UniProtKB/Swiss-Prot annotation:
Record's function text: Core component of nucleosome. Nucleosomes wrap and compact DNA into chromatin, limiting DNA accessibility to the cellular machineries which require DNA as a template. Histones thereby play a central role in transcription regulation, DNA repair, DNA replication and chromosomal stability. DNA accessibility is regulated via a complex set of post-translational modifications of histones, also called histone code, and nucleosome remodeling.
Region feature (Disordered): 1-32
Protein's recorded name: Late histone H2B.2.2
Complexes and interactors: The nucleosome is a histone octamer containing two molecules each of H2A, H2B, H3 and H4 assembled in one H3-H4 heterotetramer and two H2A-H2B heterodimers. The octamer wraps approximately 147 bp of DNA.
CDD domains in the record: HFD_H2B
GO terms of molecular function: DNA binding; protein heterodimerization activity; protein-containing complex binding; structural constituent of chromatin
Family under the similarity heading: Belongs to the histone H2B family.
Lineage summary: Eukaryota, Metazoa, Echinodermata, Eleutherozoa, Echinozoa
Transcription listed as a keyword: no
Record-level GO cellular component terms: nucleosome; nucleus
One Pfam family this sequence matches: Histone
Organism of origin: Psammechinus miliaris
Cell compartments where the protein resides: Nucleus; Chromosome
PTM comment: Monoubiquitination of Lys-119 gives a specific tag for epigenetic transcriptional activation and is also prerequisite for histone H3 'Lys-4' and 'Lys-79' methylation. GlcNAcylation at Ser-111 promotes monoubiquitination of Lys-119. It fluctuates in response to extracellular glucose, and associates with transcribed genes.
C-alpha cells in the first residue's frame, strides 16, 4: 500500500484560520461601570426635590457608599467567622452596623434596615 501524500492537489495548507466574517469590525464592547448614582439621585429627590448634584459630588457620594458597604460587609464577615457560621445573616449585618456607626445614626440605620427586611419578606 503506497504512503499518503501530504503535498499536491488535495493537501490543505497551514495558515491563519478565519475567525470572523469578512464584514465584522474589531470594536470591543466597553465594560460597564457600576455605581450607586441612580439610587443616590432618587434619595436626593425624595429629600430635596428641587436640588441637583454635580458629577464630582456624585463621585464622592459613590465612594462614600462603597466605603461604608465594605466596612459593614467586612465586620459582618468577621462576626460570622467568630460564631463559626458560613452565612452572613441580617443579624450579623445589624450587629456590624451597631459596632461601626455612632449612637443615634446606628439606631436610625437599624430601624430602616429592619423595615426594609420586613418589607422584603412580606412581598415574597
Amino acid at each position: 500500500m503506497p504512503a499518503k501524500q501530504t503535498s499536491g492537489k488535495g493537501a490543505k495548507k497551514a495558515g491563519k484560520a478565519k475567525g470572523r466574517p469578512s464584514g465584522a469590525s474589531k470594536t470591543r464592547r466597553r465594560k460597564r461601570k457600576e455605581s450607586y448614582g441612580i439610587y443616590i439621585y432618587k434619595v436626593l429627590k425624595q429629600v430635596h426635590p428641587d436640588t441637583g448634584i454635580s458629577s464630582k459630588a456624585m463621585s464622592i457620594m459613590n465612594s462614600f457608599v462603597n466605603d461604608v458597604f465594605e466596612r459593614i460587609a467586612g465586620e459582618a464577615s468577621r462576626l460570622s467567622q467568630y460564631n463559626k457560621k458560613s452565612t452572613i445573616s441580617s443579624r450579623e449585618v445589624q450587629t456590624a452596623v451597631r459596632l461601626l456607626l455612632p449612637g443615634e445614626l446606628a439606631k436610625h440605620a437599624v430601624s430602616e434596615g429592619t423595615k426594609a427586611v420586613t418589607k422584603y419578606t412580606t412581598s415574597k
